[in-house]
């Protein structure tokens, strides 16, 4: 074939690779979701298989089996050798149901609960109002019935993996009893206590969420070290008797005035010398990134009245609330890239 005679792309023109990758991002997430919901990774955990065997195990046609296997291999979820497929280390660890770090619940929660609001992201940008559907938008988004149980279940592993890195990165040797405010189903405090045998604490959340936390705490064998306290942190005083308060992935749900109120309530419950720990995906102080924090902030735009904030903003709020020795500790995890900590004067 003769070479083309056209002039081609002018020198210096950037390739559109970034745009095609962004435009088709949904294809990747839905491929992962389809693989989880059809049981692909669970099926391959029983042994490698070719396309016809995979189709038989999943009860699907050979054509979709081949396409799904190829896509998952291209995405780094499967390995292929001589026409046979098996789970990669990542898939084997995180995507097989029943294993301790199973991540599929989070993926399904995003697909079923979070995605509908994202499909109306332009509306959220134009109206400055959440677009994520809730049964009763006039009620608190966290009240019973306004968030499905799958939300709390899906976040459990996500929160556990985040807490694991927090526990390894932040010095908690001087803390004896910690209060996890807005602690959900208890994943964060369970993991912190698992990593630090000297710790005990309290999960504070709404009554129906505390019921879920109680079940998880019992299943983890932590009932002697972790209790629950039902409270609305905007309306009720927080329980005393703790020397640290943790706010893990909480303040991004609310606006600045609400967050200042939450911090004031936390400090009221602490003795002098007690520590407040804010664990979040921190936006860079110049608001240029990073990607995970910036996109989580977009997630807050479509789902809440909050946003992700900078470390500098949290530092100012803690100091204004009466904290000294404010510092930031950085680490990498699914739900946080750092902790901003302050000591009550």
Curated annotation (Swiss-Prot):
It is an enzyme of class 2 (transferase). PANTHER family: O-METHYLTRANSFERASE CICE, PUTATIVE (AFU_ORTHOLOGUE AFUA_4G14580)-RELATED. This is 3-hydroxy-5-methyl-1-naphthoate 3-O-methyltransferase. Keywords: Antibiotic biosynthesis, Methyltransferase, S-adenosyl-L-methionine, Transferase. It comes from the Bacteria. Coiled coil: none annotated. Its EC number is 2.1.1.302. It catalyses: 3-hydroxy-5-methyl-1-naphthoate + S-adenosyl-L-methionine = 3-methoxy-5-methyl-1-naphthoate + S-adenosyl-L-homocysteine + H(+). Pathway: Antibiotic biosynthesis. The keyword Nucleotide-binding does not apply. InterPro entries: COMT-like, O_MeTrfase_dom, Plant_O-MeTrfase_dimerisation, SAM-dependent_MTases_sf, WH-like_DNA-bd_sf, WH_DNA-bd_sf. Inhibited by different divalent cations, such as Mg(2+), Mn(2+), Fe(2+), Cu(2+) and Zn(2+). S-adenosyl-L-methionine binds at residue 205. The keyword Transferase applies. GO terms for molecular function: O-methyltransferase activity; protein dimerization activity. Gene3D superfamilies: Vaccinia Virus protein VP39, Winged helix-like DNA-binding domain superfamily/Winged helix DNA-binding domain. The active site is at 252 (proton acceptor). O-methyltransferase that mediates the formation of 3-methoxy-5-methyl-1-naphthoate from 3-hydroxy-5-methyl-1-naphthoate in the biosynthesis of the antitumor antibiotic azinomycin B. One of its GO terms (biological process) is methylation. Belongs to the class I-like SAM-binding methyltransferase superfamily. Cation-independent O-methyltransferase family.
